[in-house]
Amino acid sequence: MKLLLLSALLGCLATAYAAPAEGIVKWCVKSEQELRKCHDLAAKVAEFSCVRKDGSFECIQAIKGGEADAITLDGGDIYTAGLTNYGLQPIIAEDYGEDSDTCYYAVAVAKKGTAFGFKTLRGKKSCHTGLGKSAGWNIPIGTLVTESQIRWAGIEDRPVESAVSDFFNASCAPGATMGSKLCQLCKGDCSRSHKEPYYDYAGAFQCLKDGAGDVAFIKPLAVPAAEKASYELLCKDGTRASIDSYKTCHLARVPAHAVVSRKDPELANRIYNKLVAVKDFNLFSSDGYAAKNLMFKDSAQKLVQLPTTTDSFLYLGAEYMSTIRSLKKSQATGASSRAIKWCAVGHAEKGKCDTWTINSFADGESKISCQDAPTVEECIKKIMRKEADAIAVDGGEVYTAGKCGLVPVMVEQYDADLCSAPGEASSYYAVAVAKKGSGLTWKTLKGKRSCHTGLGRTAGWNIPMGLIHQETNDCDFTKYFSKGCAPGSEVGSPFCAQCKGSGKARGGDEDRCKARSEEQYYGYTGAFRCLVEDAGDVAFIKHTIVPESTDGNGPDWAKDLKSSDFELLCQDGTTQPVTKFSECHLAKVPAHAVITRPETRGDVVSILLELQAKFGSSGSDSSFRMFQSSVEKNLLFKDSTKCLQEIPKGTKYQDFLGKEYMIAMQSLRKCSDSTSDLEKACTFHSCQQKE
């Protein structure tokens, strides 16, 4: 009995000891000054404890191992924390005010009266916030490399630090190798911590102020208000401007510092809730600790929780990722030795892509290789991460990809005559189709069953739902349609009720309502099949789908169908034969386009033009056809494609989609449910898009 009581007592003590620890947030700090501030916070708020490490990398390792839970990092370190070997993610962003701005400006600052500009920095002395940091290293050095001021062939040639050492006469870049030219101007141990007096924004400015350096790469707020008149910004065009002109004279806008932690939603919520509940302690002040920007930047005004799907790549954006990659590039090689990694969605597309790869082999190499993903959105993520390079997508997906910093580079052309003499931009008509004699019109759709190509796609969702939203001003489309199939919808949604899956005896339900070709009602042909098989009353598709799938042109399930058995629903409430699409349609919309990262545009265009000459509609090699699909319809490209045409360099996704489409999307985006988690993550910052 005594033994049982003792065991019970020990169990209670263990529980009592573990409970507070479970709720405690272990904050990682990098200096004695930060440790003092953290201890003061922990004394006020018992839910915090402090873990001391030597630097950001050591903190990242400690968080991965569970020794610590969180730290605030700048963009360069957020990139490192998100790499596969660490697997951390940003969970909370600093907000610097000015209408909730989670971005800041990276600038180059010099003393007033010194006679040089950004284009004449060679041989000058430089002050950096730290090696690998956003404003202090990645942005300025990336810009100098991109502009060919710093000549660097790649890491196979030599480290970028070596090229920077040759460019500047001397520097202080905390975190560089002690004894190197990059540490020559430093005042302390050149460590990436407050042990080095010239570390971080305040330190880099002090390096400039003390006369150690000629230029400091910092943020504008690092220059004290009382001293602004003595300093100037160096603009990228070679001119100078006042410190307060940073909005027009800067190197880049970069994502705010963010709190990173392990990929654990419960832990992320706990950290955020504990931080916002802090009272009687100023998280955003470092007064009294003999340093600045401790734990958080002093310029932060509040904290903003990030969408749960946000990872470091989505947080930083394609443009900033491109800058970081430019500093980690391998030695450049000719385009002829490169292969572009095409992203295929689902097994059927992967099969066609593999065939494309095999047929593209020449001289021991192929110009195309294949990656696969379960959805287009996952492909967009892969392209952002450089795990894939390109994919052809619908206009709605061009919109999402554009929000994520990717660019449209080639467009499908459906008119063979325009392949040799292009006129206006390639386009198609979004139409509403019903069975002839159904009595259905555009005005009587409410309460009916709907067939969509996919959630967020142009003809199948964005255009019809955008029009319906303009009429009803109601974002709950389940009140409008009784049920339907819109692949990509939440499982259990009325818009999954009519989906079919793959039809396979095993695993068929796994594909049900998924936005991939295994779902038999996915895509243009799938939405039409949904109508044909009486799973829906109306199909929202492209104008060519009915003739392509009927009168003996379609697959087995459509072999007995006649195009005359179907009709178009016009917006004025009338109906028309399917041949009258130019008069009876919901919208004229841009064709599907190939998207990629900004820095791979040239390679993707040149290789696709080369492959098109070989495997296009009138290509020289008939062993493979890029624009034909044998197993299923519209794999990799739409089967109606006659050629791919280059989109003029510099064309923004907004210009490609056109004013009408953008207006429709902006209307639809008033409905938060119509915005994907990916798009929400990509549009969290105002600075993720290229200016």
Curated annotation (Swiss-Prot):
Keyword tRNA processing: no
Domain Transferrin-like as annotated: residue spans: 25-329, 340-670
Binding site for Fe(3+) 1: D74, Y104, Y201, H257
GO cellular-component term (any): recycling endosome
List of residues binding hydrogencarbonate 1: T129, S134, G136, W137
Single biological process term from Gene Ontology: antibacterial humoral response
SMART domains associated with the record: TR_FER
UniProt GO molecular function: metal ion binding
Function: Transferrins are iron binding transport proteins which can bind two Fe(3+) ions in association with the binding of an anion, usually bicarbonate. It is responsible for the transport of iron from sites of absorption and heme degradation to those of storage and utilization. Serum transferrin may also have a further role in stimulating cell proliferation.
PANTHER family: SEROTRANSFERRIN, TRANSFERRIN
Protein name per its UniProtKB record: Serotransferrin-2
Organism, scientific name: Salmo salar (Atlantic salmon)
Gene: tf2
